[in-house]
Amino acid sequence: MYTIPFQTFDWSSIKKEEHPGTTGTSFWQIFFVNGLRIRRVEYSKNYLADHWCTKGHIVYCLEGEFVSELETGEKFILKKGMSYVVSDGLSSHRSSTNDGATLLIIDGNFLKPVLADQPA
């Protein structure tokens, strides 16, 4: 169980980290709190992630449009106002965008799969 007291934070005060993709660049602003990683991520035009991600996320598209491609070949177009969720170790995925996008991404231990003999 997580205990997170009420708090605010200003994204404009959080430094952007640059993460080059196969093409384009992503810029991450990260806020950590009690086992959660909350990120505001901006994808540049023509961005393609440089790896298949196996981490779980809750993703919300704040601006623009991007494609979430699964390692199986399935592709999902997410536009402003759309979300997806996936647990750790399921559905390896990567992102791409032609025109850029801004996302809110939340991940942490709560997205780890529960084993059959463990209580939920």
Kindly give the residue locations of the regions a language model identified.
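Short histidine-centered beta-strand/loop micro-motifs
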Residues: 48-54, 70, 94-96
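Short acidic-glycine-tyrosine-enriched beta hairpin
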Residues: 72-89
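Short, conserved beta-strand element in jelly-roll/cupin
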Residues: 52-68
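A short, N-terminal "cap"/entry segment at the start of jelly-roll beta-barrel domains
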Residues: 1-40, 120
